[in-house]
């Protein structure tokens, strides 16, 4: 069983403590506990849900999952970046899952390293099994998840994310590897891992970020560049990846800016402006291109399509009014359980003077959301005017 405990982060003049009983808590997530049979221990993870998740009108929505390693360090800022970027339509809304550490050297190192003193490195594959065979199934049971998953890791976490990307099979679709610690991967080890890479890795997207390590900078950059270029050569088509170097960031300061750049690279062109779209065909081709690059079917976001439709519905050009209906109908095809999609179709038919079709679609909206007073009032007023 998982135990849910509220995680409340209070931001009051930069102070994380409650100064008054009247202060309202700003809750950004919940704590969960999962008893792992694979790891033989209890593992804590934190969850941040999208803003629309608890909206009854959006109960049909399912969300991609972002799994964050070293979650105690990265949870707050990543949740904030995801919330902001999805709010302006640059990326999809997603569920953020941050894993709290128990023994990161054990969990994040794929290979056993031989040292003078005994160590417990080399548990990376076991930890990936925990993520894929226990954590993800639990998330699927408890939340409305879509089977598109991103793995974020920094330092040793970046090493594990890279290792997961290079495996024959994985449940993750994209990877953000921030300044990965490749110190245990000498040339021989790296070549061995590259030899084992199959075409399946190139059906995924990976982002690498490199920090400025000062005197050790050349060595660090060379390791990242060597792996990136070797993967690029091995990929027969266009390599779905990006490598970025941050001259002004060190190993400790790079994660926030690299996460922003990485998630932007994954969802490049996702945030197309509603003002730049003229036809449904243009929009569908745009998202087909994104889907092809990411090997996953990303539909045009409902909110984006709705905004395009209403822009055209309010246009003085009569042709735009008919085109608005096409966009609204597209939403009903992609999101058949959306009350708002049918409500918008009703609005378009109303402007076009087809009361029968308008009432028909408002009724569909009301069936999907019986609490929709807007649809109820529209039906009532249209029936009166007949």
Regions inferred by a protein language model and the residue ranges of each:
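Residue-level recognition of tetratricopeptide repeat
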Residues: 310, 347-350, 381
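Gly/Ser-rich "nucleophile elbow"/oxyanion-hole loop immediately N-terminal to the catalytic nucleophile
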Residues: 110-155
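C-terminal catalytic histidine-bearing segment of alpha/beta-hydrolase fold enzymes
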Residues: 221, 225-228, 235-298
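A domain-start/cap signature at the N-terminus of enzymes
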Residues: 20-62, 331
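Active-site machinery of serine-nucleophile hydrolases
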Residues: 72-128
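The feature captures the conserved acid-bearing segment of alpha/beta-hydrolase catalytic domains
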Residues: 183-249
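Helix-start (N-cap) detector for alpha-helical repeat units in TPR-like alpha-solenoids
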Residues: 298-302, 321, 339-340, 373-374
